Amino acid sequence: MADFLGMMKQAAQLQSKMKAMQDELDHVEVEGASGGGLVSVRMTAKMEVKAISIDPSLMKPDEREILEDLVVSALGDARRKAEVAMQEKMQALTGGLGLPPGLGLG
């Protein structure tokens, strides 16, 4: 019975830590870029896009498709970085619990 109570206490602590981590992820920002920095995207680790920056040299009607491709690429770069930031936070939270890799509690 004591083991069960200990597990329940540990689960409650983990839930509290998960909530704090989720709140913290709102404030972790990453930036993805493409085209050598001509297009950049800033987003939170929870993948909420905060800003897109486009160099004025790309604002030409005949370069629209290139610009669109660069925006997609920058979004992908930012998304990958956001995933890494989230995984690092999760690892810090669950590292001592002995959970299998990739369990994904988030």
Curated annotation (Swiss-Prot):
Claim: DNA-binding is one of the keywords in the record: yes
Annotated family: Belongs to the YbaB/EbfC family.
Keyword terms, alphabetized: Cytoplasm, DNA-binding
Biological role: Binds to DNA and alters its conformation. May be involved in regulation of gene expression, nucleoid organization and DNA protection.
Organism: Nitrobacter hamburgensis (strain DSM 10229 / NCIMB 13809 / X14)
GO cellular component, one term: bacterial nucleoid
Protein name: Nucleoid-associated protein Nham_0463
Record-linked SUPFAM superfamilies: YbaB-like (SSF82607)
